Amino acid sequence: MSMTPREIVHELNRHIIGQDDAKRAVAIALRNRWRRMQLPADLRQEVTPKNILMIGPTGVGKTEIARRLAKLANAPFLKVEATKFTEVGYVGRDVESIIRDLADAAVKMLREQEMTKVRHRAEDAAEERILDALLPPARQAFGDEPVRSEDSNTRQLFRKRLREGQLDDKEIDIEVAESPMGVEIMTPPGMEEMTSQLQNLFAGLGKGKKKSRKLKVADALKLVRDEEAARLVNEEELKARALEAVEQHGIVFIDEIDKVAKRGNTGGADVSREGVQRDLLPLIEGCTVNTKLGMVKTDHILFIASGAFHLAKPSDLVPELQGRLPIRVELKALSPQDFERILTEPHASLTEQYAALLKTEGLNIEFAEEGIKRLAEIAWQVNEKTENIGARRLHTLLERLLEEVSFSAGDLAGQQSGEPIRIDAAYVNGHLGELAQDEDLSRYIL
């Protein structure tokens, strides 16, 4: 990650409106990962990431910042909900499975990168195997060694037809590696580590065996290309790199952290909630977790926690956990102007998406400026009157607004005389005005 904080914020601005403080905090945290890697080895070990706590109502961009950050970071990234985990000893997943899942994500990410690198070599090898199946090499009169006439006119002709896709529907018999025998193991919750170890034990069964299959050329080419690419990837080197990537660049986003905060003096289930927080402490502070890659140290993994904190407060978290999340950023509730910008400014905005979807049926719609403004006002009003669900309210309103158009798109496209359907303030009021004014209806429909 060589992007500067300013560049990271600029990239996040393409997708998320407002919330500048949160964007700056994650941009600095991400850049600090790169800065740390430039330090001498002895000093590098001492520099630990400053974990972040994002506080803000639902639907204002907390999760979206995490999603976009994952794409920008090009680093092992995992998003989890704190509510999925339970204290060790209770039924449910234990928090160490976060690191095991992060390790799996790292292997998957690096394998995809490696397979992209060897793609051209794999395509060439796959092409030769398909041509061998289409044109079995002639055998010598004395001996078993096949003779492949690389430059034979027939082979070159078939190669050309194969590349042009003329042979895609032709069926061939080809030898491909058998898939390893998948073993489904059911274990009690909280024993994922044992499940993983048993699956690894049985993973090698049937590996290396080949069998002949009758496939269409297009399907065979894809299968053989993937097989050749997998053969070109060095698994041991891949695992070593994945282990380093998890330890040095891993990012974990823990959503709904407020749901495991203890609220007031209530008892009962809160015992398990506080237990989850205490189990998270060593993970965030730095400990060693056993994964299929080996022992993973969590000292330099960046943790970003977020929560709406409607019913609980950040101070309701156990003090030790508060101390391990030193950077606090508050995300603001959305204003009517923010809703207006969300509808038009981001890359692939909601209005752009709906227009493109209807365009596939030949129906053109156009969102007028006053229509967007009125839609933003209604979204804000409904959020104020009922439950505030942030930008997610726009999805509900747009579905309702365009319900009739979406249902009759094919018929309307045939009647359209070249003029697009204009979504202006009058159209918005006609379809949403009454619903927005009636609070009882708003609660159930919008």
From Swiss-Prot:
Binding site for ATP: 17, 59-64, 255, 320, 392
Cysteine pairs bridged by disulfides in the record: none
Keyword Electron transport: no
Main location: cytoplasm
One biological process term in Gene Ontology: protein unfolding
Record's keyword terms, sorted: ATP-binding, Chaperone, Cytoplasm, Nucleotide-binding, Stress response
Compartments where found: Cytoplasm
Its job: ATPase subunit of a proteasome-like degradation complex; this subunit has chaperone activity. The binding of ATP and its subsequent hydrolysis by HslU are essential for unfolding of protein substrates subsequently hydrolyzed by HslV. HslU recognizes the N-terminal part of its protein substrates and unfolds these before they are guided to HslV for hydrolysis.
Family according to the record: Belongs to the ClpX chaperone family. HslU subfamily.
NCBIfam families: hslU, PRK05201.1
Name of the protein in question: ATP-dependent protease ATPase subunit HslU
Species name: Ectopseudomonas mendocina (strain ymp) (Pseudomonas mendocina)
